[in-house]
Amino acid sequence: MRLADTRPPFAGLANLSEAALAALPTPCYLLDEARLRRNGEILLGVQQRTGCKILLAQKAFSNYDLYPVLAPYLAGTEASGLYESRLGREELPEKENHVFCAAYRADQFEELLQYADHIVFNSPHQLAKFGPAAKAAGKSVGLRVNPEYSTQEGHEIYDPCAPGSRLGTTRAQWDAAAAQHPDLPDLLDGLHFHTLCEQDSDALATTLPALEAKFGDLLPRMKWLNFGGGHHITRPDYDLATLEKCITGTQEKYGVQVYLEPGEAWALNAGYLVTTVLDTLQNGETHLAILDMSAACHTPDVIEMPYRPPLLDAGEPGEKPCTFRLGGPTCLAGDVVGDYSFAAPLTEGDRLIFGDMAIYSTCKNNTFNGMPLPDIWVLHENGTTQPLARFGYHDFKYRLGSPR
């Protein structure tokens, strides 16, 4: 395609021909192999320069058909529970397998031990309950800590350090538990903290002193320290130098292996959602377009966060001559992607392409209101496209009851 829109979320579309675009069904997710590889190269560079290990947080990107593209660059996978841990073991069997869960189930823990190498607990109680079994199975055991230092602004739903947070152990909680169970520290091989969300390394640089103030006395006994996720390392303006200084400084000071587990950084700007305009209408002064994709079903973070995703060749409201409010076909009044402006009025049949749609999309979508799931395609580095998954009525029905 000849691109007038040079923003990073659409850079990979230069490899896509107009004919290939026209042949795609809609709605569909299109995953960009070249952009995934480019992100992997950046993350591998950080690992090579610092000696840290960077994991793929599968909660953000779980499209395992593309794991072979990322495999040369990642140290392993990070899971949030049994199924993600199993996926990582099945698809990347030679890589490290880490798992953190806010609370593990007793009836699943034995199976989890078959997949995970590192198991991180959320509370001293869970550490005491499951830690001995994990150690006996030869696993590396960690505890997620809460440094009680917030760096979030504008989307507190993603702030693990908010008052009353259920995520991570505070120092007061740890001290109380260790006083009752003096052998608890002996179970630990490492500490884990996850406090960031789509942030630059300056937030990490201010978080580390807070972590040290709360838990620095424990670090000399640890083998590793996991910096968690939320590091937007592959964003064009990300400050790599500060990140690498934080990593090397921590490793040298405490003699620990540093891990990072970003999700978005691996697949940032590496996917698109292609959709078709089904209808246009006007309500008062507002021009509306109904698409065959749904914000509520296919891009739920648009509503949950909320945020307005980038759209190819579109501007801010009023920036270009024709402004439209884009929404989905469901019955939810709030199923709205946002307001965008265009050089010409939208018409039925127009194709639109949302950018940065590889992350928190396929792994979070749903079939509310009977909405079909978008197909998943890949854009190969040579410009060809290939279907990875097609969905239909049975995918909707059999989530709701017995197959018959």
Language-model-derived ranges and their functions:
Residues 246, 257-404:
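Charged (often Lys/Glu-rich) extended helix/loop segments that serve as interaction or gating elements
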Residues 18-24, 190-194, 228:
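A short small-residue
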Residues 5-104, 108, 294, 342-355, ...:
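N-terminal capping/small domains of soluble enzymes
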Residues 194-196, 225-234, 262-265:
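Glycine-rich beta-strand-to-loop/alpha-helix junction loops that act as flexible
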Residues 205-210, 239-245, 275, 341:
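Charged helix-capping and loop-helix junction motifs
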Residues 149-151, 197, 233, 266, ...:
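Feature marks short, surface-exposed loop/turn motifs that line or immediately flank catalytic pockets
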Residues 49-224, 246-249:
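Active-site-proximal beta-alpha core segment in soluble small-molecule metabolic enzymes
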